[in-house]
Each structure stands twice: as C-alpha cells, then as structure tokens.
Amino acid sequence: MSRPDESNPLLAEQIAYYRAIAPEYEDHAIPGPGEGELIAAIEAFQPTGDVLELACGPGVWTERLLHHATSVTAVDAAPEMLARAKARVGEDRVRFVQADLFAWTPDRRYDVVFFSSWISHVPLDRFGAFWSFVADCLRPAGRVFFIDDAYRTPDELIEGESSSAIRRRLNDGTAYRAVKVPYRPADLEDRLRRLGWQVTATATSGPCYWGQGMLGRSRGEGGG
C-alpha cells in the first residue's frame, strides 16, 4: 500500500472525497444516455490477457473486464471503494491494491491498462507524467482503454470555468475539492499524439467519451 501524496492538498482532498462518497457513489451518477455505447466499445476492444484497472472505484467496470481478461489488478486509493468492489466482484482472478496512483509503482507489466472517470481527475501539470506511468505499466504492444466525461455543473466551478478545481458535495452537504479537467475527445487525441500515443477518442450520445489505442514507436514532445 502506497501513502497518499500529502504534498498536494487538492489531491489529498480528492482522495478524501472518494473515501467519503463511497457509500453513496451510485447516487451521484451522471445523467444522460450512452452507457450502452461504452459497453459495446469495451466488448469490441476485448481487454484480454492481464489487465490493470486504475481507480477501480466500486468495481462497476471490473465485472465487465472479467468477461475477457485472464486476470485483473484493480487499484484504488480509497479503501472504502475497494471494499465495495470486493463485495461486488468476489472473483479470484482479481487482485485488489490500495494505492495512491501518483505514488504507486506496479510490480509487473500488463497487456491492457484500463481506467474510467480518472483522466479528468489528473491535474494538467501531471498529464505527461501520468501517461509515462501508463506506458511503464504496459508490455510491448500493450493497449489502453479509458472512459471519462467533461461534466461539470455551474455550482461546482468555485474558481471559474477556466480552472480545473471544482467543489463537490455529499448528500449531507459536506463539500470537498477535487480536480476535474473537461477534456474533449479531439483535445485528448492531440495531447496524446504529442506524447507519442496512437489513441482514438470517441464521444457517446451522452456526456461520456471513450478512448483506445497504444503507444507509438517513439514518444514525442509536449503534453500537460
């Protein structure tokens, strides 16, 4: 288990938020269509082999990954989320790891790295470092698949539309700050291309998008 990065108060508060929201996580689902499109995209992608799931949360997508994967390593910083994921999945092909993703080093490489509702929570100044980390997690010819959204409500924008810092509340009104970068698919494709990735990002008919691809032969410059 890695220790959270306490040097960044915003990221520490983001972890605290996801620990606190775990019991009511499903109450805060983003409204709108598109879930069927995401499921169809994952089924077409076929995440086979050994899969690393980053920020697994309550295990919603872990179940789906097991339709194809030989094994899944599911990582999350919030023990409360991992407890819910373990109760949901109950599968001996899954290894659960509690770790801060900004401080964790994997002990092996994987055929696929998957993450949902995570890239938007990575600060812009850590974007390039995060994707270097993803590359280090993959075996040669390894693939990546991710799901996210750009959904932010006006009352969350405590520092204005241009800031990636937001405020979210629990059902009892308790407020926490978190990171939420409202990427658009074309923007993500461009940023990743400059880092040497070959990724296609696709919008659904709802608020979400998905991306899939792999690292190119050489990494470019830019990002973040």
Show the residue positions of the predicted features.
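A short glycine-rich, Lys/Arg-flanked "PGG" loop and its adjoining helix->strand segment in the class I
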Residues: 128-140
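Short catalytic micro-motifs in class I SAM-dependent methyltransferases
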Residues: 117-118
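Conserved class I S-adenosyl-L-methionine
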Residues: 1-46, 49-57
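Class I SAM-dependent methyltransferase SAM/SAH-binding core
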Residues: 57-103
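C-terminal alpha-helical "lid/dimerization" subdomain adjacent to the S-adenosyl-L-methionine
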Residues: 147-194
